């Protein structure tokens, strides 16, 4: 299971790359994480780490492997002592996104500016309760979620992805 969670989704990963390249958005990740002790191995016996495991034939196989580098803001619950769906973690995320937007000279970020994506209803409900907009990403249906994200952002996110995702 740990190996699967480190393999980039064939629709979401290119969408993140396209959103970042557009220069129109501050990208943040809010992840319920675990800090594993040293020496833990995944289901294939590979020493576990936090790096991404790109499939060798993926068009993004030569991208960096540090997931946090794909975002402007990366909040790991294991490192801050809060977990989703605690409203405080969403409030922290808005403060961090706002600070990053200001650092980049993009003005500020208000809670209503944030579009929060998740697959768990309780996390979405909590995000909505603090004022964020939400988008449910159903497991196994990431292409549909990325299509909706494409409509919401006005950025082409699936162009050329369908063929590569089926490799």
Which stretches of residues belong to each language-model region?
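Short, acidic loop-to-helix structural element flanking the phosphoryl-transfer center
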Residues: 1-31, 39
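Asp-based, Mg2+/Mn2+-dependent phosphohydrolase catalytic module
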Residues: 17, 30, 34-167
């Amino acid at each position: 299971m740990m190996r699967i969670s480190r393999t980039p989704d064939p629709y979401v990963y290119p969408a993140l790359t396209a959103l970042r390249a557009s220069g129109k958005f501050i990208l943040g990740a809010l992840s319920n994480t675990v800090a594993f002790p040293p020496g833990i191995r995944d289901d294939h016996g590979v020493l576990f780490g936090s790096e991404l495991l790109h499939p060798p034939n993926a068009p993004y196989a030569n991208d960096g492997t540090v997931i946090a580098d794909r975002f402007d803001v990366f909040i790991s619950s294991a490192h801050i002592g809060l977990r989703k769906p605690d409203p405080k973690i969403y409030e922290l995320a808005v403060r961090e996104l706002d600070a990053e937007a200001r650092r980049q000279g993009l003005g500020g970020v208000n809670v209503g500016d944030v579009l929060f994506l998740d697959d768990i209803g309780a996390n979405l409900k909590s995000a909505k309760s603090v004022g964020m907009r939400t988008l449910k990403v159903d497991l196994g249906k990431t292409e549909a979620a990325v299509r909706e994200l494409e409509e919401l952002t006005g950025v082409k996110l699936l162009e050329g992805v369908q063929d590569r995702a089926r490799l």
